[in-house]
């Protein structure tokens, strides 16, 4: 369906848990409180809502967290989503710590693609960012995904004074691997609000100095990679490409096509907005499908025109692990 600004909304980010097995400094550091188990939607509730979202025009679902693979039997949910009429693509965003062992079940369930979050290629920096020693497991998960033939995108958050010296090395993973390495600006949300942002335009200029033949993909090539916010570049002879997601310095709200459902069943039409609808309350109070559909449609219709990351009077205080990063 279309929102009030005539944007076609067809993409749902579905957070299945607020839990994570890493403690990334900008998302979920040590000491945060976890939700009570009953506060999180069951798979049956997620699938009921997914069927209703499909009736509203949602055809793509991305399963996120927290870390989605820490929730038991997530492949079961993927299979249920793939079996939902109207849902054509189901993707996963993961830190890949558990990916190698769970990938066979996910492939059997029909998973269409995977995004892997990795900010460094150095074990000691991985420990600094995540407070955990799981770098080898992430490497194994990434390798397993690449070998499976599943479309893979690698998401990296550039961090001043932390990983900024190895961003070219990360980008160069796209040279010999048919994947997209994407650099996402640090967003002023939750714990990331206090951290400096390396801008997308700044990083793109830096890469252009390193690779003089760096050039944008054609519109057809970009379309084949999806219709998300990333802008892609490549170097002649490379198997993959480099993407830039500049949420702060390259606002892309005019073409936004997605909404988010948190693990608690709160529908957020915009990442940076506190407005939305508590679908869990409706579900558990006995609302019928017509009432739920009306609530979903009203929330999508009311999606804000744009975020206000640059407006310090409108801070987004909720952690990314709760929103669904």
Residue spans of the language-model regions?
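Auxiliary Fe-S-binding modules of radical SAM enzymes
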Residues: 1-11, 176, 186-325
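Canonical Radical SAM [4Fe-4S] cluster-binding loop centered on the CxxxCxxC motif
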Residues: 4-44
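Conserved, mostly hydrophobic/aromatic
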Residues: 16, 20, 24, 63, ...
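Short, small-residue-enriched loops and turns at beta-alpha junctions
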Residues: 16, 35, 67-71, 159-162, ...
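Glycine-centered loop/turn positions within well-structured domains
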Residues: 22, 123-124, 251, 277
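Residues that scaffold the ATP/ADP-binding catalytic core of kinase and kinase-like folds
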Residues: 23, 27, 71, 124, ...
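A short acidic, helix-capping loop that chelates divalent metal ions and anchors anionic groups
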Residues: 32-36, 122-129, 190-194, 278-279
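Radical SAM/AdoMet-radical enzyme domain recognition
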Residues: 40-63, 70-184
């Amino acid at each position: 369906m279309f929102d009030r600004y005539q944007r076609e909304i067809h993409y749902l980010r579905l957070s299945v848990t607020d839990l994570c097995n890493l403690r990334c400094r900008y998302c979920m550091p040590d000491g945060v409180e976890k939700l009570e188990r009953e506060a999180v939607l069951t798979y049956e509730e997620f699938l009921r809502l997914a069927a209703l979202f499909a009736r509203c025009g949602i055809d793509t679902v991305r399963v996120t967290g927290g870390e989605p693979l820490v929730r038991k039997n997530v492949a079961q949910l993927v299979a249920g989503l793939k079996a939902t009429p109207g849902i054509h693509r189901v993707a996963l965003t993961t830190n890949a710590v558990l990916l190698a062992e769970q990938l066979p079940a996910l492939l059997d369930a029909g998973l269409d693609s995977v995004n892997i979050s990795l900010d460094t290629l150095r074990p000691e920096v991985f420990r600094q960012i995540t407070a955990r020693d799981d770098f080898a497991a992430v490497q194994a998960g990434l390798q397993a995904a690449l070998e499976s033939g599943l479309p893979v995108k690698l998401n990296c958050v550039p961090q001043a004074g932390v990983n900024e010296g190895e961003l070219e090395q990360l980008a160069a993973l796209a040279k010999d691997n048919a994947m997209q390495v994407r650099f996402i600006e640090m967003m002023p949300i939750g714990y990331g609000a206090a951290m400096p942002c390396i801008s997308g335009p700044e990083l793109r200029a830096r890469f252009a100095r390193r690779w003089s033949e760096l050039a944008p993909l054609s519109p057809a090539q970009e379309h084949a990679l999806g219709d998300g916010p990333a802008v892609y570049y490549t170097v002649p002879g490379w198997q993959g490409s480099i993407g830039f997601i500049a949420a702060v310095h390259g606002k892309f709200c005019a073409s936004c096509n997605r909404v988010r459902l948190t693990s608690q069943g709160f529908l957020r039409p915009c990442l940076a907005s506190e407005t939305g609808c508590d679908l869990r309350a409706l579900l558990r109070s006995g609302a019928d499908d017509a009432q739920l559909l009306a609530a979903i449609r009203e929330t999508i219709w009311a999606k804000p025109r744009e975020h206000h990351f640059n407006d310090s009077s409108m801070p987004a205080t909720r952690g990314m692990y709760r929103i669904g990063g």
